[in-house]
């Protein structure tokens, strides 16, 4: 049936979540969602039947096992089933509910309403196939870091969000009072998701500029640099991008870096300090960490 979807379920170690997300996205999946299953994590993702044959799914299962082996984790267990479009549209959404993050944020799926008498800043999100629902520890750490940074320094800021995903961090920064956020992502699906969520949260495009690309695009848009940088992507990509990110920075610029496993923190720190950055704080959650950095003062 042309309107059928494969529902792919992966049971894995929690530490593999971001790797599994990446692999499923690279495979072409949409609507990824996670749920805790005792000490494991269940990841569900969906792809149209016409885009994947059984041999493709078998190959995906093998790639997931190879990814886990390389990282030193137990092999994930994968299975799949066909479902019609109506079931797909509702199935993955069942796993995602309203959640509080930090002291000020409430993450609300687009199809739900926030509770009455809510006093928190509401971020409404429909992620589509983009990463960033607020359930991942790295997203939570970044939002909490933004909350601390922008609450303690309330003057208007210009911020760059590198690898914006669903736009959740950019939107959070605007709600906390950032003057303007420039969001970029190399994935066109992420760019579209961020634009949709900008509209969903009724944010003026003048306050949240969204472009496909990476740091080079930001350097053209913001030649005078930014006050803050948020970057929730893989550690290897952060390391590769730092020479360009340095060009975005002013002497007073701060940064929030995540997507980094605790075991990778030292490698990231080692390349930051020679390039003029100081790690002011390191927050951990599960196997993940977030580095709060600032320019080193001579």
UniProtKB/Swiss-Prot annotation:
UniProt keyword terms in alphabetical order: Cytoplasm, Methyltransferase, S-adenosyl-L-methionine, Transferase
GO terms, molecular function: protein-lysine N-methyltransferase activity
Subcellular location: Cytoplasm
GO annotations of cellular component type: cytoplasm
GO biological process terms on file: methylation
Top-rank lineage group of the source organism: Bacteria
UniProt binding sites for S-adenosyl-L-methionine: 139, 163, 185, 232
InterPro entries, per database record: Ribosomal_L11_MeTrfase_PrmA, Ribosomal_PrmA_MeTrfase, SAM-dependent_MTases_sf
Keyword presence, S-adenosyl-L-methionine: yes
Transmembrane segments: none
EC assignment: 2.1.1.-
Reaction catalysis annotation: L-lysyl-[protein] + 3 S-adenosyl-L-methionine = N(6),N(6),N(6)-trimethyl-L-lysyl-[protein] + 3 S-adenosyl-L-homocysteine + 3 H(+)
Primary role: Methylates ribosomal protein L11.
Family of this protein: Belongs to the methyltransferase superfamily. PrmA family.
Protein name: Ribosomal protein L11 methyltransferase
Origin species: Microcystis aeruginosa (strain NIES-843 / IAM M-2473)
Lineage of source species: Bacteria, Bacillati, Cyanobacteriota, Cyanophyceae, Oscillatoriophycideae
Gene this protein is translated from: prmA
């Amino acid at each position: 049936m042309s309107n059928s979807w494969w529902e792919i379920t992966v049971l894995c170690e929690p530490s593999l979540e971001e790797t599994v997300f990446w692999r499923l996205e690279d495979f072409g999946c949409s609507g990824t969602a996670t749920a805790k299953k005792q000490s494991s994590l269940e990841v569900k993702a969906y792809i149209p039947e016409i885009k994947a044959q059984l041999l493709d799914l078998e190959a995906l299962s093998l790639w997931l096992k190879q990814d886990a082996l390389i990282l030193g984790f137990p092999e994930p267990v994968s299975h799949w089933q066909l479902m019609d479009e109506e079931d797909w549209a509702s199935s993955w959404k069942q796993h995602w509910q309203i959640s509080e993050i930090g002291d000020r944020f409430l993450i609300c799926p687009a199809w739900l309403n926030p509770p009455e008498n809510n006093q928190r800043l509401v971020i409404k999100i429909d992620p589509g196939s983009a990463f960033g629902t607020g359930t991942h520890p790295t997203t939570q750490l970044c939002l909490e870091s933004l909350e601390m940074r922008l609450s303690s320094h309330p003057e208007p800021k210009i911020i760059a969000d590198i690898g914006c995903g669903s736009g959740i961090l950019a939107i959070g920064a605007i709600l906390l009072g950032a003057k303007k956020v420039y969001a970029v992502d190399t994935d066109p699906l992420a760019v579209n998701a961020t634009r949709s969520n900008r509209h969903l949260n009724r944010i003026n495009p003048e306050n949240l500029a969204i472009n496909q690309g990476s740091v080079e695009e930001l350097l053209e848009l913001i030649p005078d640099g930014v006050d803050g940088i948020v970057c929730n992507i893989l550690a290897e990509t952060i390391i590769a991008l730092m020479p360009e990110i340095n060009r975005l920075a002013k002497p007073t610029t701060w940064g929030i870096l995540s997507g980094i496993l605790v075991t990778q923190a030292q490698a990231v720190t080692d390349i930051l300090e020679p390039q003029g950055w100081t790690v002011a704080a390191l927050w951990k959650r599960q196997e993940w960490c977030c580095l709060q950095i600032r320019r080193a003062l001579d």
